[in-house]
Amino acid sequence: MWRGSSAGGSQGAAMEGTGGELGGQGNWGLEDAPGLLARASLPIMPAWPLPLASSALTLLLGALTSLFLWYCYRLGSQDMQALGTGSRAGAVGGRPGGCSEAGRPSPGRSGESGEGPRTEGLMSRRLRAYARRYSWAGMGRVRRAAQGGPSPGGGPGVLGIQRPGLLFLPDLPSAPFVPREAQRHDVELLESSFPAILRDFGAVSWDFSGTTPPPRGWSPPLAPGCYQLLLYQAGRCQPSNCRRCPGAYRALRGLRSFMSANTFGNAGFSVLLPGARLEGRCGPTNARVRCHLGLKIPPGCELVVGGEPQCWAEGHCLLVDDSFLYTVAHNGSPEDGPRVVFIVDLWHPNVAGAERQALDFVFAPDP
């Protein structure tokens, strides 16, 4: 141990004593420095007892965790409220203005966008809720659709004749009539089920005279001469109608592209009486394709979609993109009887699987 000293030893004696304080008297060396420094720092920063510091840190972390969980709960509650009120806010149907070809009423005038900015904001909130639960992967087109909303008037559609009322998914191939090969499996399944579906219609049919109320299961006419019996309405199964139409329900269960869990999805019988006409309408979205299976097609019936005329054929399917302006008419005589088709909403073949999942979440039917 190094000690301070002087030639006569008097300096060493002066350093000896009983005190150990820095600057006082006593024996000290290099090994005593840590203790001296610690004692010197006590008046500046008193050390907390270890148990007390640990308890304070635990309480702080607990408070931060509780605050984070509360924030997540509030955020999730707002999203679920938006999801719960979406379709009740007119998310799909728009304003009732006439009878669409199977399903909820289409907008009263072509291009009418229903809720406008309110619907656009609701869709964006739902999409963010979906992304938080799953992922944004593959959501480019859906995000653009949510940000842009439907096109009023002649916006992003083809030459202004494609005007979906609610959802316009960009970059989808567009044509008024879709080739059968695009949905070959579902088309062939429905056509092979034609006899069973026709029998089901005979079992639930009535005289359509208009002098008596429609029987159970049939919707009241939303336009003169237009009647519907739906097995699926806005993505919700109608159990009583499905039990009355087992052949049609079995065919629906075998389809691969049926929009069965989406408010854009409908399926059922559509009846048009002689003299009835539905003109200048557009469906709510270009993300679907409507499959028309002809059941009873008398002379004088016509379907014009996007300016292109077509006609149904009994036992055969016609694929229609009803986001284009369309007109349906029965110009036959009363003796010809009604025109009857079985209509099913299928996914557009170019909507990817991830996009379908997201749109099913965003446009989920009411519970």
From Swiss-Prot:
Q: Which SUPFAM superfamilies match?
A: Clavaminate synthase-like
* Membrane protein topology class: Single-pass type II membrane protein
Region Disordered, as annotated, extends over 1-27, 88-122
Pfam (any one): Asp_Arg_Hydrox
User: Which residues point to the Cytoplasmic side?
Assistant: 1-49
Q: Its domain of life?
A: Eukaryota
For this protein, the Enzyme Commission number is 1.14.11.-
Q: Which UniProt key words apply to this protein?
A: Dioxygenase, Membrane, Oxidoreductase, Phosphoprotein, Signal-anchor, Transmembrane, Transmembrane helix
Question: Which Gene3D superfamilies does the record cross-reference, listed alphabetically?
Answer: B-lactam Antibiotic, Isopenicillin N Synthase, Chain
Q: Name one cellular component (GO) term.
A: membrane
One Gene Ontology term of the molecular function aspect = dioxygenase activity
The record's InterPro entries line, in alphabetical order, gives:
Asp/Arg/Pro-Hydrxlase, Asp/Asn_beta-hydroxylase, IPNS-like_sf
Localization: Membrane
| Predominant location category | membrane
Lumenal compartment ranges equal 73-367
Q: Which residues carry this modification: Phosphoserine?
A: 106
Where are its TM segments located?
50-72
Give the similarity note: Belongs to the aspartyl/asparaginyl beta-hydroxylase family.
**What name appears for this protein in its UniProt entry?**
Aspartate beta-hydroxylase domain-containing protein 1
Q: Which organism is it from?
A: Bos taurus
Q: Which gene encodes it?
A: ASPHD1
